[in-house]
Amino acid sequence: IVMIDNCYCEFVATQEPLEVGADIIVGSLIKNLGGGIASNGAYVAGKKELVELVAERLTSPGQGKEVGPSGGANKMFLQGIYMAPNAVASSLKVAVLTSLAMEKLGFNVSPKWNSERADIVQTLIFNDRDKMIKYCQGIQQGSAIDSFALPIPTDMPGYDDEIIMASG
């Protein structure tokens, strides 16, 4: 069985993993496929028998995929899916521009601006904790949402090192 965690990859390549041989894929609706507006949720797609096995584990035994989102969540899921292609395209443009600009400023980046991409993740290697913190704080200060917030590194469950995040 080939299972793919497809988070951050939806709508990036011309083919999705199921089209090139994966048996089952999973992903989060709060990332690419949710268009930035779905507040929670996930998806499972693939071979029918595998999806049914997963559905039995993710919901109530015996009910499987017959039970699903409730409480008005479907509206946000569908709006997110509608907006996702545009959100992913914008993310890719920003990643390419950031890669080019940061490389020209002397930073190591991965992938390079002109590399083929399989997801929207852009790695910037600072080799200096303070520069990384200042970069994240600058991104946050220039953001349309929560520009007043000051990101700082802190411990986060699931990570061995301190994590700092900026968004907006």
Language model features: what each stretch is:
Residues 13, 21, 50, 54, ...:
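General structural feature for long, well-ordered alpha-helical segments within catalytic domains
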Residues 103-168:
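Conserved C-terminal alpha-helix-loop-beta "cap" of PLP-dependent enzymes
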Residues 1-89, 93, 102, 106-110:
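Conserved PLP-enzyme active-site core in the AAT-like
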